[in-house]
From Swiss-Prot:
GO cellular component: plasma membrane
NCBIfam families: PRK13548.1
InterPro entries reported for this sequence: AAA+_ATPase, ABC_transporter-like_ATP-bd, ABC_transporter-like_CS, P-loop_NTPase
Protein name: Hemin import ATP-binding protein HmuV
Domain ABC transporter, first and last residues per copy: 2-242
PANTHER family: HEMIN IMPORT ATP-BINDING PROTEIN HMUV
Subunit: The complex is composed of two ATP-binding proteins (HmuV), two transmembrane proteins (HmuU) and a solute-binding protein (HmuT).
Keywords: ATP-binding, Cell inner membrane, Cell membrane, Membrane, Nucleotide-binding, Translocase, Transport
Organism: Methylobacillus flagellatus (strain ATCC 51484 / DSM 6875 / VKM B-1610 / KT)
Main location: membrane
EC assignment: 7.6.2.-
Superkingdom of the organism of origin: Bacteria
UniProt similarity note: Belongs to the ABC transporter superfamily. Heme (hemin) importer (TC 3.A.1.14.5) family.
Length: 269
């Protein structure tokens, strides 16, 4: 279980996150949404332990992240970053094998290659295995990075696992966006994996997440079931976007559509 307890983050004199609290259980997928500059990426960096909170704490499986052995934590928690720069001519397979490093203390083992290939199969990227990562398109790189983090937490024997995704759909076309979130949903449905994903598209978030967390100006505006978050009042309060509520014709998921004629105040901002 992931617990965020009255957590704040200051960088220098600037406060990026204010008194944030929530709990996410394995088997659940939570989407973090909010306008640009809301603090979404800062929050996910706190959740993975890359940043240390200025106040409060983040706990995984009942223990503060600061108390975890880093190697053991890396076997249970993986972060797919929004931008992953690679300075060497690694193949896609070699990038994915990086996710296996916490599981061995030397050369890759046969099972590491098997898991890496299974992860590539999971994201539909087997054909990219021997291609140089830097020559791939943004969308292909995103799929390789997804395979890397899946390979990192592949084994259920490690106990509960945490999958953190920082804008996993950012570089993808619509089909690949849905494929990526379908994979995230599948892993949450395993029952022992908690998934947290930053998603800019509220309608995408509503289709795949159990709950949506709305973040604005570093403050948690709300975290609730999709039906409670996807209301015109809630969305306008977070995004300053006048909108109407629709229901998806396939399944009835609540969807948001911006009003066709924005106000002059919207244009000005």
């Amino acid at each position: 279980m992931l617990e965020v307890i009255h957590t704040g983050l200051n960088i220098g004199s600037k406060t990026l996150l204010h008194d944030i609290s929530f709990i996410i259980k394995p088997g659940e997928m939570v989407a973090i949404c909010g306008p640009n500059g809301a603090g979404k990426s800062s929050l996910i960096r706190l959740l993975c332990g890359e940043l240390k909170p200025s106040s409060g704490e983040v706990r995984w499986e009942g223990k503060s992240l600061a108390e975890w052995n880093l190697l053991q934590l890396a076997r249970q928690r993986a972060l797919m970053q929004q931008h992953a720069e690679v300075g060497f001519a690694y193949t896609a397979l070699e990038i994915i094998l990086l996710g296996r490093h916490p599981h061995h203390l030397g050369a890759n083992r046969p099972q590491d290659y098997q898991i890496a290939m299974a992860a590539m199969q999971e994201v539909g990227a087997v054909h990219l295995a021997e291609q140089i990562y830097s020559t791939l398109s943004g969308g292909e790189q995103a799929r390789v990075q997804m395979a890397r983090v899946l390979a990192q937490i592949w084994e259920s024997s490690q106990g509960a696992r945490l999958l953190l995704l920082d804008e996993p759909t950012a570089a993808l076309d619509p089909l690949q966006q849905h494929r990526m979130l379908t994979i995230a949903r599948k892993w949450a449905d395993k029952g022992d994996v908690a998934v947290v994903a930053i998603v800019h598209d509220l309608n995408l978030a509503a289709q795949y997440a159990d709950r949506i967390a709305l973040l604005r100006d570093g403050r948690l505006q709300a975290i609730d079931r999709v039906e409670s978050i996807m209301t015109p009042a809630m969305v306008e309060a977070c995004f300053d976007l006048p909108c109407v509520l629709l229901n998806h014709p396939d399944g009835g998921t609540p969807m948001i559509a911006a009003r066709r004629h924005p106000s002059s105040s919207m244009i000005a901002t």
